[in-house]
Amino acid sequence: MQKRELIYEGKGKKMYATDDPNLLVAEFKDDLTAFDAQKRGNEAGKGALNNKISTQLFKLLESKGIVTDLVETISDTEQVVKKCEIIPLEVVVRNIATGSLSKRLGIKEGTVLPFTLVEFYYKNDDLHDPLVTDEHCIIMGLVKSEKDLQTLRHTAREINSILFKFFAERNLKLVDFKVEFGIDKDGNIILADEISPDSCRFWDATTNEKLDKDRFRQDLGSVKVAYEEVLRRILS
């Protein structure tokens, strides 16, 4: 397989075509962004850490029956992934109130939610990724059917159940996380993109120290040191 031209660049990754029409190369970047990219930074080694973390978590999920786009890791910062049509929704799973949920609804940060909350956000930078309802998703054609929304919600909850237990065993609270899904060449909905401290909130279960991108958002110290600690616990 040969890596070819750049076809897309996002905030955290570059996507390249290959000589196989069904495969892409995803390259993780060291760039950091927050607040709709109003705040920008860069920390050497961050991309490699996210690649390692996401690879480990996708392999864990695959072992539990969650189908993902991961094929193999080919370098410190690169993965081969299945080409799929990305569904234009960010699926956000929340276990503990913080961030936009606390700001939007006035729920005190750190409040443990009585059940896992799953929200959909429309992936649109111009609109600042607004929260959308099931009906909005159908009206706007973001998914093909109500059944697809049920699949997204069910799979997101399954992912949460697996990861929440996994991280609890490593003294980490999985506060919330964002996942994205795609439709593969056979029409199946599969987990895509990444699961990393860029897309999750992790708090140390003893101290509540934040070990994720909130360190960049809130100027809490080195992102790399925190991501290294998350990886260390994943591998422990």
From Swiss-Prot:
Pathway: Purine metabolism; IMP biosynthesis via de novo pathway; 5-amino-1-(5-phospho-D-ribosyl)imidazole-4-carboxamide from 5-amino-1-(5-phospho-D-ribosyl)imidazole-4-carboxylate: step 1/2. CDD domains: SAICAR_synt_PurC. InterPro entries: SAICAR_synt/ADE2_N, SAICAR_synt_PurC, SAICAR_synth, SAICAR_synthetase, SAICAR_synthetase_CS. It holds the Pfam family SAICAR_synt. Keywords: ATP-binding, Ligase, Nucleotide-binding, Purine biosynthesis. Its EC number is 6.3.2.6. GO terms for biological process: 'de novo' IMP biosynthetic process; cobalamin biosynthetic process. It catalyses: 5-amino-1-(5-phospho-D-ribosyl)imidazole-4-carboxylate + L-aspartate + ATP = (2S)-2-[5-amino-1-(5-phospho-beta-D-ribosyl)imidazole-4-carboxamido]succinate + ADP + phosphate + 2 H(+). It is an enzyme of class 6 (ligase). GO terms for molecular function: ATP binding; phosphoribosylaminoimidazolesuccinocarboxamide synthase activity. NCBIfam families: purC (TIGR00081). Belongs to the SAICAR synthetase family. This is Phosphoribosylaminoimidazole-succinocarboxamide synthase. It comes from Campylobacter concisus (strain 13826).
